[in-house]
C-alpha cells in the first residue's frame, strides 16, 4: 500500500497487513492504538443479486460489498461499536446481529459514550436495526435526533 505522508520526516504511519479468504480480500490497519479491519466481498460487485453473495470473513457474516469494523487494540472485534457498511443488508457474528435491513444500504455507525451516531443512505424509506449492548441516551441519524427505540440489545430505526 502507498501511504502519503503529511510531512517528509513523519514516522508514525499505519501498519497494514493483507488478509484473504473464500470470496473476500481484506486489510488490517493498525494505527495509534486502533485496529480497523476492512473487507471486500468479491461476490457482491453487482453481478449477483441474491443469497449467493454472502461471505464469512474472520467470523463475520455479510452480504455487503465492503465493510469495515474499528476497535481499540487489545480488545476483540466482536465488541466493536464503529462500523462502515457499503451496500449491505446484514452484518452478523455468531448468534449476534449487528445490523439488519430488508434493503441494501450504506451505513456508518459510531458510538461514543451514551450517544449513537448513524449515517444511512441507499433507500427512500429506512427500516433497520442495530446492535447495542446498552441503551443509548440519544440516537442521531443523518444529523437528526430520533426517538430511541431499544429492545433486546437492538435499536430500531424507521424513517
What is the role of each PLM region?
Residues 2-4:
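Charged, amphipathic alpha-helical scaffolding segments
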Residues 6-158:
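Non-catalytic terminal regions with compositionally biased, polar/charged low complexity
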Amino acid at each position: 500500500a502507498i501511504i502519503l505522508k503529511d510531512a517528509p520526516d513523519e514516522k508514525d504511519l499505519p501498519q497494514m497487513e493483507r488478509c484473504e479468504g473464500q470470496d473476500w480480500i481484506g486489510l488490517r490497519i493498525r494505527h495509534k492504538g486502533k485496529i480497523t479491519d476492512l473487507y471486500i466481498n468479491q461476490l457482491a460487485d453487482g453481478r449477483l443479486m441474491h443469497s449467493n453473495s454472502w461471505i464469512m470473513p474472520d467470523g463475520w457474516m455479510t452480504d455487503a460489498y465492503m465493510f469495515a469494523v474499528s476497535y481499540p487494540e487489545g480488545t476483540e472485534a466482536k465488541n466493536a461499536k464503529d462500523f462502515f457498511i457499503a451496500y449491505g443488508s446484514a452484518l452478523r457474528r455468531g448468534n449476534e446481529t449487528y445490523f439488519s435491513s430488508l434493503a441494501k444500504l450504506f451505513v456508518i455507525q459510531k458510538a461514543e459514550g451514551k450517544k449513537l451516531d448513524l449515517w444511512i443512505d441507499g433507500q427512500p424509506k429506512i427500516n433497520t436495526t442495530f446492535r447495542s449492548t446498552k441503551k443509548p441516551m440519544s440516537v442521531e441519524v443523518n444529523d437528526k435526533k430520533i426517538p430511541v427505540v431499544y429492545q433486546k440489545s437492538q435499536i430500531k430505526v424507521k424513517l
